[in-house]
Amino acid sequence: MRIELRSWSSIAFLFTLFIAYVVSESNFKPDIKLTKEGEIAKEYNYFDDSSNILVLRKDKLAISFDDGVSWKNVKETENERVIRYQFDPFNNNRAFAFTIDKFQYVTNDKGETWSKFEIYDPKNEKEHLTLNSIPHILFNAKNPDLAIFVVYHCPEDKKISNQCVNYHFLTTDGFKSNPKSLQTDASICTFAKSTKSYDVGKDETIYCSRNKLNSFGHIVESYIVASDDFFKTESKINHALAKSGSIIDIRVLQNFAIVVVQNDKFNTKSKVSLLVSKDGKNFNEADLKVDISYGIMTFLESSSSSIFLAVMDYSNSFRKFSLSTVYSSDSSGLSFSKVLDKVQGGSIQKVETIDGVWLANIADEIKDNKGKSKTLLDMLMGGGIDKNIKSRISYNDGEDWNLLKINNDGSCTTESECSLHLLNPTEKSGDGKFVTGPTPGILLSVGNKGSKLEKDINRMNTWISRDGGISWDFALDEPCLFSFGDQGNIIVAIPYYGKNKMNSSNMYFSLDQGKSWENVALEIPIFPLTLTTTVDGTSQRFILSGLIDSTPKDKADYSFAETLYAIDFSKAFGGKKCDSKKDFEDIYTRLDPSNDKPICIYGHKEKFRRRKQNSQCFVNELFEDVKVYDDPCECTVIDFECASGFSRSKEKECKPDKKKLANICRDKKSKKISLPDKALASGNKCKNPKEAAKEFVKTKEFKCSDYLDEDDKDKNKGNKHDIVSTFNEFDSELQQYTYVEQGETYSGENIILRTKANVAYASNNGGVEFVKIPVSDEIVTYYPGLVPGQVILITDSEKFYFSIDGGNTFQKKTAPAKPNVIGARIISFDKKDTEKFIWYSSENCDNPFSRDCSLVAYITEDGGENFQKLKEDVRSCDFVADVFEDVSDEIKNMIYCTVEDKSSRKLMLLSSTDYFKQSKKVFDNVVGYAITGNFLVAATIDDAEQSLKAKVTVDGQIFADADFPPDFHVDSQQAYTVLDSASKAIFIHVTTNNENGHEFGSILKSNSNGTSYSLTLDKVNRNRIGYVDYDRIEGIEGVIVSNIVANDHSKDRKKLKTQITHNDGGEWSYITPPVIDSKGKKYKCNGKSLSKCSLNLHGFTERADYRDTFSSASAIGLMMAVGNVGEYLEDFDKCSTFISRDGGITWKEIKKGVYMWEYGDRGTILVLVNAEKTTDKLMYSLDEGDTWHDYKFAEEPIDVLDLATVPSDTSRKFLIFGKSDRKMVSYSIDFTNIHKRQCQLDLDNPNDDDFEYWSPTHPSTPDNCLFGREAKYLRRAIGHDDCFIGSAPLIEGFKVTRNCSCTRKDYECDYNFFRDSDDTCKLVKGLSPSNRKKEMCKKENAFEYFEPTGYRKIPLSTCVGGKNFDTWKVHPCPGKQKEFNKHHGKELNSGSLLAVIGIPIAVFLLATWFVYERGIRRNGGFKRFGQIRLDLDDDDFHPIENNEVDKAINKIVKGGIVIVAASIAGFKTLRKVDRMLFDKVTSSLFRRRPGHRNYVHVPEMDEEEELFGNFRDNYEEELEEGTNNINEDFNDEPNDYEYEEETNDEVDSRLFNIDDQSDEELQSATPEDN
């Protein structure tokens, strides 16, 4: 019994001890040491496998050797300004501290001691290099003594320029000595052995990119170089893509060497391509089938068998919060497939320590938004568009994605679409990276359960997973910052904030892998910043930093200090270490939720040993990483990937790839090829691969003729397989669409589209994909703004949607009233400020024709947040200050409005500079106004004459009369259309016949200030609403195409003929037709004049979309049109499609029939599509229209509505809209990959690149002079059809080689003159020439003016010298007689008289005496010369010639003989002429008496000699005669310019808002309009 009692006593004693132990553990509190700091640290980072921590605080470096308990400054850097530090990822003992001074620092003993090294200027090795950017170091994974110090250096005065370079400095002794400049002009360098797994080349192997620049700073060539001896020798790795583009990055990722190439080296936003190598020698292009820019591509954590990268949509203003698409490659790194799209921002994370497990947040459409307003968090989490964020997990490397399961919660199951959604599953590791944690499958995250991630962080909790993220348990109520220690056996968490969103006063910890949690109060509450521990997560110590208010009594002050807690858990469990046999369990990763069996990835499954959850001990293996044990799996089909020639389909099957097969056939030059469809993935560890291959790999045979065209060798057609067609379908018919110009806040080829169902769609990739803009309101219209990226969606209520990034994001706004319902425009935009615009609503307009109906204008300056009333009873308003060249502060806010006077019903023009607090009446009766270039033209009504008068201003304040020719009386019921002012002169079409169906008029052209107009072309066709057949050819100065009405006096249907001018309206001619048609047959024009057989083109008035023009400003000289060869323009069904390469001088028929056309890549890609018949094919040309090829873009024929591309015509994507089975569809046609290189531009060596110079000319001038100069434009050279132009700065190559002498082509008819049929300028009958005194004398420093000659210089012309047809008789300006006389030498004093008269007489007398002495007297005197017969040869006269002077003198003598003889003969002849004729000639030449000529005929250059003989010598006299005779009136000459004025129709005020025939309605034109 005593023994038993003793036994029971022992048991009781042990039980008591156990209870005490448990109680003590439950009451365990970690040791916490508090430190206060006055300055906030930039970051805290551990040395790996160490308790040493570095911190940078106010540019001073400090270190702790005891997990943050105590700190001291690094003494070696105490006197330095440290700007950054960096750890060596391959050497745990080494770190670097960078300063802005001459010394840099390195430690090789985890911060115990630091040594310094210096960086010297490579250009002057005696001087230290000044660091004006933060440097970094490239490390070698195999040899720690090798490293490269890299700094981006700019000259002091040029911080950002092409003179900035990357300097590379090499160390071979681990910085024991100063690094030496790496002798290579490299942009980017890296060690081949930058990762432990890339075992290619030597330790010394370095890859670099090198750019060859020209004097303009442009990259001419980019290539890769490799060296094994630090560039004593090197090898060049050539790749065509790299050579023509720009290498912007070289990196080694796992066992892949990757080169990132910017395809368009002149455009930083252009697409990039990847070149990948696994052997370091052969780089091949990866088939990443997506447009990506380097700034939006992120390389994710990858494996040795696959590259993972995320492509972020940076097109909107929220940038890093945008949505991403994730791609992964096969084991070669060359074939990519989409893994996941619509990833929220960068919210995708690989789970650490476990292969193939990824966590991601996906953005789903909100279907029940109901027009709710969005918060900023909505915008950020949804990438700028309302989205529901849902979390997914993949445990087979992205093959499948599943919802996150919550354990033991029957109310929330994945079957009911309820799951866990995570905000952020990462912690900050000891080295500063954000990772899921180096634990064996233990994860922690903030999130919430439900159908989506909440957008209020207060509704989120903290959750824990112990199976690598597949299933989760609730952990803590608050959202917390967290960190893991002792391989996940210690978890520390602190709430982001405390109660009432104040600072956190407590922290939590768990010692049983999150099963239970304890609470510890903090001595000082903080706003937590950092919670971290050692890099490998094996320590039992943590540091926690946070902000405290350093001035708590001052509530308005935002001064903060930092508090640092050092937390120690080493005394928990009494410091007990776990028993390796009792306290551990084996855990497999990636368990299949359906059967709890491990899932194999890369041919293996992993397991690791983990402490049991309830064991009360620590692993206590400090700095020992979690060990993972591999078990190989049997090979299955998932261990194989698609082989060469095959691509993975959406169904995850290996399908033949036409493009790849074509390339293989082309390379092998075989008729048939046999290929396996699959291959074992490189690096796969599965068992029995050969046996498995027999089961899973199939060999397939292909006929190359099925993949290669018969004309496959034709280089001009490219590879059709490189063209990509993408289909989209819409819910209703197309109503309007617009390309939105790229801006600073976004990039991309953005399109806004609206259907007839009032649903709006947006695309930011050129129409490859369209997304429905997620708004609940009907969009009745939209307006693109004048600032790139600005778009406003209009609803039928006060609500509107505002975007400044091209429609990527929209903000919901409220207007002061509904948009107007009377058909007026709804928005007027400011030219520069995106936040400023005018909104038009209507009041009392139930009956739009009621006198009470009023249009009210409101203005906003903050993007629609606030509005103020601008003016009532307006018709239209515009911000006009930025229209004018000189904008003073006085008019910077100037607005013009047309306002209706309710009493008189007249329309007034008002101006204001203070938003109509005060206003000025400019005109009291106007029809409207138009803005063109730097001019504002107002159409006023003269009540007395019942006529329209044009007024012009160039400063918004002073208006001048626009003087039309006097015979142009524009009735108040007629109209005129302002066409453009692109050539420094205003072109206006004045309607002269307004009869329905027979409308036409005259085009008038102004002088340079828009005030004086003359007729340039008559009988020009217009349509009912005022649009005119007038097309200014973009890209070439002065070329205009117009259609005239040939039967202007007939009531029959109009007969149109096309005319073209090449000198800005100075001369017009019919278009010379091609000789043969597209089938090689000759046109029947032989023997016919150009007026009877010419090329006639359908013009502006007949276009379904007014944005479709003959030409493109970026495709210099190219024109396409639909028309016919004949006397008149025929109907469309009798027309063909034509092309010109020389600005409309010569033409070629492309195809019979009517086709729509578009230009791409500045004319290197031309596309046609049938406009009349259903079709599934398009035609394209890659050689400026020389050859054409078919491409099938659709599965079945469609009715094409429109063919479009970006307005600049620089894209390589096109968009076809059409109808198919009553559905509206679109096809994006992408030619991006058809050119394999970018055209090389080398302005220093223009003969060695892909461009050539081309000069526009006038068809009748042979000397390449146009507008008084010979201009040369760069175009892609003929035959260089295998490259694209992109954003090459061709404008920098533009040059004017010379200014030409003035000729007739540089002049046009002056005011009151008209061009007659004989091409001369004649005075309008009954009129007198204009007085130019006022115009010319008001110019600064002017002192003279000229009488008009009937001609004036074309404003564009820069000719010098030559024939000045516009200047003859000169007069002094009032008060400028003295300056005038001085300039013309009429102000003579005694000195000037001597210079002008005396000196020439003296010289003449001296010369005469010398000639007499040496040439006449000693050769026999005058007697000898009297014997000379004029009909004898020179041999009869033999003068004395002893030297060269004698010879010269005797030549003068002989010349004198001829002159005297000619004079005598001429006098004798004149004596025989009738005296009256003689008097007439002399008076005409010398007395300037009025005669009988009222015009001057100046023939063409090739006619001049034949018609007028010595006209060139006497053209001044001809002009003089004309000048003095133009006042003569001849009643017997018929007046061919009498017009009937029609007054039946009311003026359409819209005509006065036409600016280059493209106002807001043109920007959003509908293919079916008109």
Curated annotation (Swiss-Prot):
It comes from the Eukaryota. BNR repeats lie at residues 63-72, 105-116, 463-473, 508-518, 801-812, 858-869, 1138-1148, 1179-1189. Residues 1-24 form the signal peptide. Pfam families: Sortilin-Vps10, Sortilin_C. Residues 25-1390 are lumenal. SMART domains: VPS10. It is found in: Golgi apparatus, trans-Golgi network membrane; Prevacuolar compartment membrane. Residues 1412-1570 are cytoplasmic. Residues 1529-1546, 1556-1570 have a biased composition (Acidic residues). Keywords: Glycoprotein, Golgi apparatus, Membrane, Protein transport, Receptor, Repeat, Signal, Transmembrane, Transmembrane helix, Transport. The chain crosses the membrane at residues 1391-1411. One of its GO terms (cellular component) is membrane. One of its GO terms (biological process) is Golgi to endosome transport. Residues 1517-1570 are annotated as: Disordered. It is a single-pass type I membrane protein. Functions as a sorting receptor in the Golgi compartment required for the intracellular sorting and delivery of soluble vacuolar proteins, like carboxypeptidase Y (CPY) and proteinase A. Executes multiple rounds of sorting by cycling between the late Golgi and a prevacuolar endosome-like compartment. This is Vacuolar protein sorting/targeting protein 10. The gene is VPS10.
